């Protein structure tokens, strides 16, 4: 089993309701730095057909781990309007 002990929930808003969420999810998974893990991805309907992706990213409670770093990587991906850390908690 891994030694991850915290999880950060990062909410990603696509730039448009027409964005292919499957493709966007794969692009976002590809930019998560190797030292992090991914527990799951959920889809959250927002309004007017817009759906947010919620990434449950695993990390360690030690220097060198920052969920803001992951959110910044997500913001660089095409078709991402915003990426914000919603919560961080121990697991």
UniProtKB/Swiss-Prot annotation:
A single GO molecular function, which one?
A: translation elongation factor activity
From which residue to which does the signal peptide run?
A: none
Q: Which UniProt keywords apply?
A: Elongation factor, Protein biosynthesis
Report the domain of life of the source organism. Archaea
- Report whether Protein biosynthesis shows up as a keyword of the record: yes
Annotated TM spans: none
Q: Which CDD domains match?
A: EF1B
Q: Which PANTHER family does the annotation name?
A: ELONGATION FACTOR 1-BETA
Q: Which NCBIfam families match?
A: aEF-1_beta, PRK00435.1
* The protein's role, per its UniProt record: Promotes the exchange of GDP for GTP in EF-1-alpha/GDP, thus allowing the regeneration of EF-1-alpha/GTP that could then be used to form the ternary complex EF-1-alpha/GTP/AAtRNA.
Family statement? Belongs to the EF-1-beta/EF-1-delta family.
Q: What is this protein called?
A: Elongation factor 1-beta
Its source organism is Pyrococcus abyssi (strain GE5 / Orsay)
Q: Which gene encodes it?
A: ef1b
């Amino acid at each position: 089993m891994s030694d991850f002990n915290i999880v950060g929930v990062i909410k990603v808003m696509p730039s448009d309701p027409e964005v292919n969420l499957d493709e966007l999810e794969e692009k976002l998974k590809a930019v998560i730095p190797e030292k992090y893990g991914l527990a799951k991805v959920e889809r959250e309907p927002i309004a007017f057909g817009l759906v947010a992706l919620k990434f449950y990213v695993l990390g360690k409670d030690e220097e060198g781990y920052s969920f803001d770093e992951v959110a910044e990587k997500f913001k660089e991906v095409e078709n991402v309007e915003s990426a914000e850390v919603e919560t961080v908690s121990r697991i």
